[in-house]
């Protein structure tokens, strides 16, 4: 049984706006959202009711609302909730794509609900939606070396050794979102989690 109902679907990439953050680990969600839009020939436009940037794409065989909040990561929840309300998307049909410290760099995992793992963007989304029971595409960035502050680590650009692999990670994130919509959570997890 697919986890997504026949209601509208909202796919959100999390990140920070502006060129200073464009290539940081924390902006992986934005990078995957940009890739999904480009693959469908779509362009993000300001969404007046939410303040986010949004577009509509075909993904997993259906029309999907794709968005990037335009506030900073830690306050992205209200824009996500406003989009969900505007498009009549239940929380179980909201898919949030985000960087994940608790996964090795390059790993992609799918999840429904659960904790935020210290991710303030997810915390903001959970508070604004009034539930943690939404879908996540978790994009592994790994833990910082030594005693480096994780908050500083995610705001840095990728290490030189990682940079060449970022496009593949974004492709896999985009594929994971599509499988999630097409197959539902469990079947999509079976495929995505076998990627390594």
Swiss-Prot record:
GO terms for biological process: protein quality control for misfolded or incompletely synthesized proteins; rescue of stalled ribosome. Keywords: Cytoplasm, Hydrolase, RNA-binding, tRNA-binding. It is found in: Cytoplasm. The record marks 16 as: Discriminates between blocked and unblocked aminoacyl-tRNA. The keyword Glycoprotein does not apply. The active site is at residue 26. PROSITE patterns: PEPT_TRNA_HYDROL_1 (PS01195), PEPT_TRNA_HYDROL_2 (PS01196). It catalyses: an N-acyl-L-alpha-aminoacyl-tRNA + H2O = an N-acyl-L-amino acid + a tRNA + H(+). The record marks 99 as: Stabilizes the basic form of H active site to accept a proton. InterPro entries: Pept_tRNA_hydro (IPR001328), Pept_tRNA_hydro_CS (IPR018171), Pept_tRNA_hydro_sf (IPR036416). Its EC number is 3.1.1.29. TRNA binds at residues 21, 72, 74, 120. One of its GO terms (molecular function) is tRNA binding. It holds the Pfam family Pept_tRNA_hydro. One of its GO terms (cellular component) is cytoplasm. HAMAP family: Pept_tRNA_hydro_bact. Belongs to the PTH family. PANTHER family: PEPTIDYL-TRNA HYDROLASE (PTHR17224:SF1). Hydrolyzes ribosome-free peptidyl-tRNAs (with 1 or more amino acids incorporated), which drop off the ribosome during protein synthesis, or as a result of ribosome stalling. Monomer. This is Peptidyl-tRNA hydrolase. It comes from Mycobacteroides abscessus (strain ATCC 19977 / DSM 44196 / CCUG 20993 / CIP 104536 / JCM 13569 / NCTC 13031 / TMC 1543 / L948) (Mycobacterium abscessus). The lineage of its organism: Bacteria, Bacillati, Actinomycetota, Actinomycetes, Mycobacteriales.
């Amino acid at each position: 049984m697919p986890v997504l109902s026949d209601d509208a679907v909202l796919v959100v990439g999390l990140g920070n706006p502006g060129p200073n953050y464009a290539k940081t680990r924390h902006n992986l969600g934005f990078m995957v959202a940009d890739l999904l839009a480009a693959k469908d020939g779509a362009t993000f436009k300001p969404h007046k009711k939410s303040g986010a940037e949004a577009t509509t794409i075909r993904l997993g065989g259906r029309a999907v609302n794709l968005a990037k909040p335009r506030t900073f990561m830690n306050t992205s929840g209200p824009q996500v909730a406003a989009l969900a309300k505007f498009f009549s998307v239940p929380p179980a049909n909201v898919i949030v794509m985000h960087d994940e410290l608790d996964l090795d760099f390059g790993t992609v995992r799918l999840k429904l609900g659960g904790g935020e793992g210290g991710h303030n963007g997810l915390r903001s989304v959970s508070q604004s939606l009034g539930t943690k029971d939404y879908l996540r595409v978790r994009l592994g960035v790994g833990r910082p070396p030594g005693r480096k502050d994780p908050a500083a680590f995610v705001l840095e650009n990728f290490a030189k050794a990682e940079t060449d692999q970022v496009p593949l990670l974004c492709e896999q994130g985009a594929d994971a979102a599509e499988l999630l919509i097409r197959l539902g959570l469990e079947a999509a997890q079976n495929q995505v989690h076998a990627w390594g």
